[in-house]
């Protein structure tokens, strides 16, 4: 096979943005797999060109020219942008390939607009695609490896792609690393709940960290593990061996069950500066919390633990999912407000319940019940739309509570209380920037606007109530405006999708259950 010129587009952003927090952080959210893909393409004898779109570039100008194949990596929020990019390249005779979360969640829809749609991806699968590289105008080929790859290219092999992306980060630069794939927990709303936990090689982790120290004096590593520290001793030993002088700082997403005080002492000693635990709900949720308590008892226990974590780790973000079927009335929202008061140093990150196609076993139940709405992918970023009709609320009642909770959490009073409860300067600064930018005040403004439209926009309200499936003008206008130039390249029908495709597929003929969770190894 001749040497191919390959474009790889990592869509961190769904559209152009000018948000302060996005400017600071988006480059740090670059995916690892686009970089891995580039290394595999090199090893197969090809010439890859990687672009990470953060929302601040002129994407039309940066897209690679004169390529044979284009790979696009996208979350569902970038689905419409990905479809437009694919259409642009297909018009030029270029074969297009979609990977990433959107490909796994919506393969049937993505295959309408891409030649190849890849689920789990390994080097052999990439080689097969490049060998064939055939256009499929009548419907793309959906392919997947049997499971995640057992190993990934080293940080040294990825470095030139990491370095180019981090040049876009103006202040804080996170080097992306990963030590495990999948998750042992059983949260039925999570894309990893049915993916077997698979640690990658700890000797390779140590080697990567040693290499990183040859490039930066005091680097920050952003770990992409779905749940960092399941094999806690192995992680800590690898870090200690690679960085005995504790020059590296780490940011991790972990579960409360792993954040005991002895573990926190070791995390602090090894440079962990930020943790992002999932609270999810004040009711039982997949064994990710070490408590079996619910309601106010859980609020008090979790707040106590979060305050203890803040004595060791300077930055804590707590993750919540709003609109779950266990939520009813004012209580879950009032409990969260109480938590904000009891643990003022934690930054609360709220996600609206979303059913991302095939992402999670729970989505089948929502589809069987007729509760999933065909909201355009562009809005499925956990905040700009909720595509599952709430079980125990009508839309005005839900948004009244959402606006109230968000306003409470990012009020001037809450921001000021967060400052003294956060121990060091950079975390204080980050919390303020996030609160007054798109993640705090921006969401208050958006949720308030949408709540108002529920009373005045009959087309939108009817769509959200499931009375019709016609995409409301509200969504069409925003997609057109936000995509700008790329709106012209949206293929016909790109805003619509079959929200019940998972249910209709052959896989759904057999009941799918989240596999039984396994106890995490003792620390």
PLM regions: where:
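Radical SAM [4Fe-4S] cluster-binding motif and immediate context
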Residues: 153-326, 334-338
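Flexible glycine/acidic-rich beta-alpha junction loops that bind and position SAM and/or redox cofactors
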Residues: 14-18, 109, 185, 231-232, ...
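Short beta-alpha junction loops
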Residues: 100-105, 256, 322, 354
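A structural motif corresponding to the C-terminal end of an alpha-helix
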Residues: 38-47, 215-216, 270, 305-316, ...
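Acidic, low-complexity intrinsically disordered segments
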Residues: 2-216
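Radical SAM enzyme core and accessory elements
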Residues: 1-8, 42-47, 65, 163-165, ...
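Structural recognition of alpha->loop->beta junctions
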Residues: 109-128, 270-275, 336-350
């Amino acid at each position: 096979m001749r040497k191919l010129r390959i474009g790889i587009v990592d869509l961190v952003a769904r559209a152009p943005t000018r948000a302060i927090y996005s400017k600071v952080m988006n480059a740090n959210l670059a995916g690892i797999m686009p970089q891995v893909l580039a290394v595999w393409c090199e090893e197969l004898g090809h010439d890859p060109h990687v672009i990470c779109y953060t929302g601040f570039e002129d994407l039309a100008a940066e897209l690679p020219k004169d390529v044979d194949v284009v790979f696009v990596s996208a979350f569902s929020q970038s689905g419409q942008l990905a479809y437009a990019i694919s259409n642009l390249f297909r018009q030029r005779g270029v074969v297009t390939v979609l990977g990433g979360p959107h490909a796994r969640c919506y393969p049937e829809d993505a295959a309408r607009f891409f030649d190849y749609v890849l689920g789990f991806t390994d080097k052999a699968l990439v080689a097969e695609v490049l060998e064939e590289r055939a256009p499929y105008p009548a419907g793309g080929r959906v392919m997947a490896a049997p499971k995640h790859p057992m190993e990934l290219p080293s940080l040294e092999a990825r470095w030139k792609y990491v370095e180019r992306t981090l040049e876009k980060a103006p202040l804080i630069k996170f080097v992306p690393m990963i030590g495990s794939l999948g998750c042992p927990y059983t949260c039925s709303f999570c894309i990893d709940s049915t993916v077997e936990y698979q640690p990658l090689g700890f000797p390779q982790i140590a080697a990567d960290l040693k290499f990183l120290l040859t490039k930066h004096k005091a680097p920050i590593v952003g770990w992409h593990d779905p749940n960092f520290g399941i094999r806690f001793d192995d992680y800590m030993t690898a870090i200690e061996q690679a960085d005995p002088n504790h020059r590296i700082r780490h940011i991790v997403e972990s579960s409360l069950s792993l954040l005991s005080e002895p573990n926190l002492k070791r995390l602090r000693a090894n440079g962990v500066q930020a943790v992002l635990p999932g609270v999810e709900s004040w009711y039982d949720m997949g064994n990710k919390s070490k408590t079996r308590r619910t309601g106010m008892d859980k609020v008090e226990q979790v707040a106590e633990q979060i305050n203890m974590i803040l004595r060791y780790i300077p930055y804590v973000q707590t993750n919540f999912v709003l609109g779950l079927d266990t939520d009813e009335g004012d209580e879950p929202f009032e409990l969260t407000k109480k938590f904000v008061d009891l643990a003022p140093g934690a930054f609360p990150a709220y996600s609206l319940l979303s059913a991302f196609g095939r992402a999670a076993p729970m989505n089948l139940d929502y589809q069987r019940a007729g509760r999933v709405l065909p909201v355009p992918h562009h809005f499925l970023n956990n905040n700009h739309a909720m595509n599952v009709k709430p079980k125990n609320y009508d839309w005005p009642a839900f948004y009244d509570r959402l606006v109230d909770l968000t306003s409470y959490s990012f009020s001037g009073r809450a921001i000021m209380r967060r400052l003294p409860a956060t121990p060091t300067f950079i975390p204080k600064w980050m919390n303020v920037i996030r609160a007054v930018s798109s993640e705090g005040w921006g969401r208050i403004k958006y949720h308030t606007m949408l709540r108002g439209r529920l009373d005045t926009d009959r087309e939108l309200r009817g769509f959200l109530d499931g009375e019709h499936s016609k995409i409301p003008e509200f969504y069409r206008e925003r997609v057109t405006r936000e995509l700008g130039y790329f709106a012209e390249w949206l293929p016909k029908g790109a805003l619509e999708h079959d929200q019940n495709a998972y249910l209709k597929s052959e896989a759904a003929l057999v009941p799918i259950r989240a596999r039984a969770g396994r106890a995490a190894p003792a620390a």
